[in-house]
């Protein structure tokens, strides 16, 4: 930026004192300081935005490079798998696996799979709550019945200290 030393600042201050006058100099100095601060903040914001854009562009380039590398690896794997499958089929004498067993691999469904699909991985709330023993629930203060705060106070207040209401 501009190289301003102590001597140059003193010279600028003396000229401003003579030109502007001692009454208006503090107000002008505050205004100039505020404008300089605003300009510095704006410059810092622009620098940060430019650096973010540069980093974003670098990340985009890296992402495309990684995606290309992943596609290359995937192609290589598929190529090797198809070559090995072809070599295995040739070694077995060209027998088709689906013709031999009467169906493909997708026709085989294990017995646990159908039971698992029935629940879709979810247990009912009652099953989860019933899984804990009652002594554990009592020891860890697991609530069995939902009560309001007033109902809990009434339940645990000693009988002698209860206030009688007009309607009881």
From Swiss-Prot:
**Which residues span the membrane?**
1-21
Q: Name one GO cellular component term.
A: TAT protein transport complex
Q: Which UniProt keywords apply?
A: Cell inner membrane, Cell membrane, Membrane, Protein transport, Translocation, Transmembrane, Transmembrane helix, Transport
The UniProt entry, under Pfam families, shows:
TatA_B_E
A GO biological process held by the record:
protein transport by the Tat complex
Subcellular localization, per the record? Cell inner membrane
GO: which molecular function terms?
protein transmembrane transporter activity
Give the bilayer topology.
Single-pass membrane protein
- What does the subunit section of this Swiss-Prot or TrEMBL entry state? The Tat system comprises two distinct complexes: a TatABC complex, containing multiple copies of TatA, TatB and TatC subunits, and a separate TatA complex, containing only TatA subunits. Substrates initially bind to the TatABC complex, which probably triggers association of the separate TatA complex to form the active translocon.
What job does the chain carry out?
Part of the twin-arginine translocation (Tat) system that transports large folded proteins containing a characteristic twin-arginine motif in their signal peptide across membranes. Together with TatC, TatB is part of a receptor directly interacting with Tat signal peptides. TatB may form an oligomeric binding site that transiently accommodates folded Tat precursor proteins before their translocation.
**Similarity comment: family membership:** Belongs to the TatB family.
Q: What is this protein called?
A: Sec-independent protein translocase protein TatB
Q: Which organism is it from?
A: Cupriavidus pinatubonensis (strain JMP 134 / LMG 1197)
The lineage, from the top, is: Bacteria, Pseudomonadati, Pseudomonadota, Betaproteobacteria, Burkholderiales
